[in-house]
Amino acid sequence: MKPYLKNLTVAIALVASTGFSQIKDLDFNAVESKVIEWRHHIHQNPELSNREFKTAEYVAAHLKSLGIEVQTGVAHTGVVGILKGKRKGKVVALRADMDALPVTERNDLPYKSEVVSKFNGQETGVMHACGHDTHVAILMGVAEILSQNKDFAGTVKFIFQPAEEGSPPGEEGGAKLMVKEGVLENPKVDAIFGLHINSGTHVGKITYKPGGMMAASQRFVINIKGKQAHGSTPWQSVDPIVASAQIINGLQTLISRE
């Protein structure tokens, strides 16, 4: 946890023109233990997209305890914290996603999720299987560190985003709705950073690239209509199963060759 806290804090320092010497001596060790505790709590209490009510309350309460200006109810359950430095400067935003997945946890951990909810009309377990519990806890830690070190130029926006995994059918949500509701305005954001933990990256390391990264997936539906016929005259029918199989194979070829 500590390397992530340092990396995010240093990123803000660089963009906001804060000297690294001002923040490198902060007590990351003290905050690290809190971040682990927060992560365990969030992991044990996961919530699905657009339903992150308790997670939002947990985050908002922490930010308020630090004296940070807090906005709630952004894009349904999103939370935004605003921390102003002692001098004027750029506005830097940090973003973490909050929602969990409809997955039943099979780990044997003291903080494992036992939560059960409804997803697409079916009962399912709920689990932070994509690391969002860690993202939230890290950003809460960065907020605490910076709130104790306000001698920087500019403003920091802490954006806790709901519904990164996709809104429920028929609902708006996620980053798109947050932007629509003005999360990048008042004050206008000059730069924004997001992170995602990765088991393939060594502890203490970060990876980055120019241009797009952490792209979202999209969903679409293909309806295939067949034509019924008697079993003795299959040539008079249109078999939707065979057609579906061909389409699936063709789409998979696109993915593997691009």
What are these regions, as identified by a protein language model?
Residues 115-127, 133-134, 145, 152-258:
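Histidine/acidic-residue-rich, glycine-tolerant segments that coordinate divalent metal ions
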Residues 16-17, 142, 240:
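Alpha-helical transmembrane segments and their juxtamembrane interfaces
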Residues 1-23:
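Bacterial Sec-dependent N-terminal signal peptides
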Residues 2, 11-13, 71, 84, ...:
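Generic marker of residues within folded, mature protein domains
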Residues 3, 7-8, 40, 133-136, ...:
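Hydrophobic alpha-helical segments, especially transmembrane helices
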Residues 3-6, 24-26, 98, 148, ...:
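Intrinsic-disorder/low-complexity regions
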